[in-house]
Amino acid sequence: MVVLGVVAIALGIGAPLFATLAANNRMSSATNDLVSSLIAARSEALKRQVTVTLCPTPDGAGACVAGGSLGSGWTVFVDRNADGAISADDVVVQQHGALEGDLRDGVTATPVDLMFTAAGTLAIDAPRPDFHIQLCDQRGDADTGADIAAGRWIQISGLGRQQLVRARLDIQSDRNPLGGC
């Protein structure tokens, strides 16, 4: 009877902690995958001296979806004619399927296509050509410990450099054009 009591207490404490750990790992994995693809896209653009595009492609369907969600998958490809669409003469560099779990994304631009020029900069015609991506799950901006938010905010400067923001107060701040999770 005592053993059952100890097991029940251990499960009561351990199960929620395990669920939080699993959710944190899913968020970290998804964020790392997306940032790796952004780095690969910029690197390929610089290396090949041509436009490289990262666009939403649901489950690796092979075609960019205007207004699509990066949460459903994305493709990085050498965009020889810089039209944001995968053509026969374009080279696919990377494909990623849908994000695991109930992760969703938010972006500051439509269409969601991110085009890196031969100089590695973003091909956005705007006074301040920054791009922002936010990854969220059902926990929103909840503090997961040490003031780290459950969600993530990726800032991409006009120069094509990425910065990952994890601090809860920064994600919820006025600096975040997506307004937090």
Predicted region positions:
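N-terminal helix-rich module
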Residues: 1, 9-39, 43, 47, ...
